[in-house]
Amino acid sequence: MTVPLRVGLVAGEASGDTLGADLIHALRRLAPQTEFFGVAGPKMQAAGCEVWEPSESLAVMGLFEVLRDLPRLVRLLGRIRDRFLAVRPDVFVGIDAPDTNLRLARRLHAAGIPTVQYVSPQVWAWRRGRARSMRESVDLVLCLLPFEKSFYDEHGIRAEFVGHPLADAIPLEVDRPSARRALGIDSNAQVVALLPGSRRGEVSRLAQDFAATARWLAAQRPDLVFVAPMASPAAREIFAHALELHAPGLDVRLIDGQAQA
């Protein structure tokens, strides 16, 4: 009887959740019995990943937010690390979020667990010294951009170019009429997209400013149509509350995902 491959995953935000779900689907096509577990978002969970902790628990941004949440994050990462060490997956894949995942990968790698970083940190642009520490943390880097592989080859780190998922998701030629029909927007409307981000803390900090700006624009141009893609139910709730407080009565169409449209 073949023992199924066991893959540990950590995705720290909405974009990582999308990448993780695509990875799960791709691996399942090759090895249908593969088991997935770790820190995941709703898309990864729907794809079949056992969720130890939700991705949003790691999604913090900004110095104040990090300092405020530091004790909680340290405890959380300690629990995740210890659980991976106890379960010992066949491979650990950290998806984006390099500050979190490379630190975790170093501990797991030292314990003999193969480690992969999916999405290269921008070591080719700044803090190039991180490449040395990556040699001690990861066995493989999966790169979204073709030139990144060459950089890692030069630094003695195994890497593979796997392509950027948006290359498949976004057409080369945008069909604006179809996109507007899908969103229920008149073909001649002047549309303003409100994009407050995907992280809970990010949306919390920016939602009031977005709402106030939309209210001001609507006062100047009553014909404008506002559309706001929401990365998660939590982001939708936060943004809707900000609109109620700071732009009451303003018609803003909150849509789930579909930022590419």
Task: Identify the role of each PLM range.
Residues 4, 188-189:
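Phosphate-coordination loops involved in phosphoryl transfer and adenosine-cofactor binding
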Residues 5-180, 195-203, 219-220, 225, ...:
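Active-site and donor-binding regions of nucleotide-sugar-utilizing enzymes
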Residues 27, 214-218, 242-247:
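Conserved hydrophobic residues forming the short capping helix/wall of the S-adenosyl-L-methionine
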Residues 192:
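Long, contiguous binding/interaction regions
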Residues 207-212:
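Short acidic-capped amphipathic helix/loop micro-motif used as an active-site/signal-coupling element
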Residues 231-241:
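Loop-centered beta-sheet repeat module
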Residues 239-257:
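Nucleotide-activated donor-binding/catalytic signature segment of Leloir-type glycosyltransferases, i.e.
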